């Protein structure tokens, strides 16, 4: 559910072809592709260290991986279904499993949103998604916008002057404005002179 099978198969076919041409592992090519995408979006060099290996089909128990499928991934605004635990709590739980600090979690979510990596376009506040910048935080903390629920884990941002819906977000997105600790981090990145810091922290 996190990725559509069609999209995933298409991408993996391309990665496998490149890996064969340059005698590298598919795992290395996937990481390198991510690095190149971030470099193009930020204009900053991203370090790369090769050496990952690929497991063969014989070495992999495909059935055992089903229990590893994510129930929720707040970094991508994905949630498989409704749970008794809130989406933002599940984001914090995943962050702790990854060993991320609140600061690292904040900058990672902001970067993913600025690049348009989100389900159902929630939290995608940027007009162009090919640039890594602090636009998510600037627009999230815009005092001219009022938020109202529009569905399960979905909110509409209403322009206080025109009354028009100008953006949409999830509970995960809005927690960076409502939680005091996360808001303090978001305010740092939302500053006009904080874009370079944001990009460097993300990388």
Show the residue positions of the predicted features.
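Long, well-ordered alpha/beta core segments of mature domains
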Residues: 1-203
């Amino acid at each position: 559910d996190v990725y559509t099978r069609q999209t995933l198969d298409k991408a993996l076919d391309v990665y496998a072809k490149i890996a064969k041409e340059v005698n590298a592992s598919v795992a290395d090519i996937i990481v390198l592709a991510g690095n190149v995408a971030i470099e193009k979006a930020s204009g900053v060099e991203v370090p790369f260290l090769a050496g990952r290996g690929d497991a063969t089909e014989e070495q992999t128990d495909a059935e055992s991986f089903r229990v590893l499928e994510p129930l929720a991934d707040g970094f991508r605004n994905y949630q498989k279904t409704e749970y008794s635990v809130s989406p933002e709590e599940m984001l914090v739980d995943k962050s702790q499993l990854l060993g991320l600090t609140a600061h690292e979690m904040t900058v990672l979510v902001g970067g993913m949103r600025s690049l348009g990596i989100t389900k159902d376009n929630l939290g995608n506040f940027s007009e162009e998604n090919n640039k890594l910048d602090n636009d998510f935080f600037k627009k999230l903390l815009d005092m001219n916008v009022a938020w109202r629920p529009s569905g399960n884990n979905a909110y509409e941002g209403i322009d206080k002057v025109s009354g028009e819906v100008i953006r949409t977000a999830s509970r995960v997105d809005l927690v960076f404005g409502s939680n005091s600790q996360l808001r303090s981090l978001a305010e740092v990145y939302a500053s006009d002179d904080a874009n370079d810091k944001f990009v460097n922290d993300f990388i």
